[in-house]
A protein has these predicted regions:
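N-terminal cap/leader regions of alpha/beta-hydrolase-fold enzymes
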Residues: 1-235
Length: 235
């Protein structure tokens, strides 16, 4: 269920121009941004390229500007995918389901800090971690952006309000599958949902858009605004 799309347009893992800091949350190095006194936290879970990706950190800063305490943990333990490594080999030691226990430890640490509500957004690889948290109601609201490894049974099992942002061109979660996800969410009258497929973009565009692709840039901005609106509605 993983392929070249997960690896396209890898980020340059350089730091600088960020508003936040790297701190330790539970046992994980984490990029944190925003009001440390906020009672609402947003956890962003990266794709295979990890928590150091500049565009992911800039998105974290943007979410933080809405008044949230934003945490981007290093669930890859300092070992993000590098383009020279076959992704199937890398995944043997970096399964998203195995990261759920670490995600729960981050959530526990945030609650101990005084956080009362937690939302989570997962990108590609990270979406699987988020959906597992949503199935156990470990968070109050979920967002899955161009998800990988997420199944229809996963979506049927979520217990919190869930948004899914999909791409028109995506072999990992093609529009047909996203529409099935939407039907499953509609059938769950206990939760709210938001599903949208963005035209003209491909898997990974929300955090790995190409700067010279006007459509991808526009749709990334649109998706970011939709994500913020979703959190504002549910939190």
């Amino acid at each position: 269920m993983s392929g070249p799309e997960c690896c396209e347009n890898p980020p340059t893992l350089s730091t600088g121009g960020e508003s936040g800091d790297v701190l330790q949350i539970a046992s994980l190095n984490s990029y944190v941004s925003g009001d440390a006194n906020s009672k609402i936290a947003i956890v962003l879970i990266s794709d295979v390229y990890g928590y150091g990706a500049p565009k992911l950190r800039k998105l974290a800063d943007k979410v933080a500007s809405a008044g949230y305490y934003v945490v981007v943990p290093d669930f890859l333990h300092g070992d993000p995918l590098i383009p020279e490594t076959p992704i199937q080999d890398w995944l043997k030691n970096h399964g998203p389901v195995e990261s759920v226990v670490f995600a729960k430890s981050v959530i526990t640490a945030l609650k101990e800090k005084g956080i009362s509500k937690i939302g989570a957004a997962g990108f590609c690889w990270g979406a699987k971690v988020v959906v597992e948290l949503a199935k156990e109601a470990e968070i109050q609201v979920a967002a899955l952006l161009h998800p990988s490894f997420v199944t229809l049974d996963d979506i049927k099992g979520v217990k919190v309000s869930t948004a899914i942002l999909g791409a028109e061109t995506d072999k990992m979660s093609p529009p047909e599958l996203v529409k099935e996800f939407e039907l499953a969410l509609k059938a769950n009258t206990e939760i709210d949902h938001f599903v949208k497929i963005y035209s003209g973009v491909s898997h990974g565009w929300t955090v790995r858009w190409k700067d010279d692709d006007e459509i991808a840039v526009k749709c990334a901005k649109e998706a970011h605004e939709d994500l913020l609106a979703w959190f504002a509605k549910c939190l």
